[in-house]
């Protein structure tokens, strides 16, 4: 019995070309054919599927609200949790160093692998099969799309706060450390004319920027940072 049969059962798709699934599970640290190209494709396919569902289920929502709702459905945390729920982490192929450093628990690796699998299913069986699988993974969250509230992320709220007061837009300075497959992003956020400077650190640039923006908001007098998320948008 193929060791990937159990995973394919969880995914809801039996691959015609099993090599596609194997590549989707292979991280760039392994030194073999890896999942980066499939991840690139899967990111777009996943975004389209969720955007299409939102468009149909939220006919009154504006473009900006639709964008924020889509981002909340496909952000790194959401995808990493779904990847773990499907048991994808059990089948990942990593390099020795990445394996020892806990790569099978790394949020970015889990999210990337899920996107790569979306790309692999799309190539293997087409859009409709891919759509069926993706919507099944999301489960009840798909039914909740009609009730989903479009929350703004920290960077958007900070920009709106500054624009309302005719202040300059924030500057985000980024420093990258670590190997290519295990990078850490340190982002400093500041605004010309204001005394504050905040820092955000994460394994993705966008999330580090959100953390820095949220911390900056929390320093402002009216407490705009309360209750917002550091969503990876």
Curated annotation (Swiss-Prot):
Cofactor(s) demanded: Mg(2+)
Disulfide feature: none
Pfam families: dsrm (PF00035), Ribonucleas_3_3 (PF14622)
Domain of life: Bacteria
Assembly with partners or alone: Homodimer.
HAMAP family registered for this protein in UniProt: RNase_III
Role according to the record: Digests double-stranded RNA. Involved in the processing of primary rRNA transcript to yield the immediate precursors to the large and small rRNAs (23S and 16S). Processes some mRNAs, and tRNAs when they are encoded in the rRNA operon. Processes pre-crRNA and tracrRNA of type II CRISPR loci if present in the organism.
Protein's recorded name: Ribonuclease 3
Gene of this entry: rnc
């Amino acid at each position: 019995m193929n060791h990937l049969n159990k995973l394919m059962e969880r995914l809801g798709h039996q691959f015609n070309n099993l090599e596609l699934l194997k590549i989707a599970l292979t991280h760039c640290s392994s030194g073999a054919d890896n999942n980066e190209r499939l991840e690139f494709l899967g990111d777009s396919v996943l975004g389209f599927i969720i955007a299409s569902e939102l468009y149909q289920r939220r006919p009154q929502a504006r473009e900006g609200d639709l964008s924020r709702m889509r981002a909340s459905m496909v952000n790194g945390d959401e995808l990493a949790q779904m990847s773990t729920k499907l048991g994808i982490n059990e089948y990942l192929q990593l390099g020795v160093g990445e394996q020892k450093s806990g790569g099978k628990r790394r949020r970015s690796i889990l999210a990337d692998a899920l996107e790569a699998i979306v790309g692999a299913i799309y190539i293997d069986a087409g859009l409709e099969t891919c759509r069926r699988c993706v919507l099944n993974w999301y489960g009840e969250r798909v039914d909740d799309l009609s009730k989903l509230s479009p929350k703004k992320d920290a960077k958007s709220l900070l920009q709106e706060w500054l624009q309302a007061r005719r202040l300059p837009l924030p500057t985000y300075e980024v420093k990258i450390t670590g190997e290519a497959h295990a990078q850490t992003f340190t982002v400093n956020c500041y605004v010309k004319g204001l005394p504050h400077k905040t820092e955000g650190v994460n394994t993705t640039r966008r999330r580090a920027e959100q953390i820095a923006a949220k911390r900056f908001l929390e320093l402002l007098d009216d407490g705009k940072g309360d209750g917002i998320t550091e969503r990876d948008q």
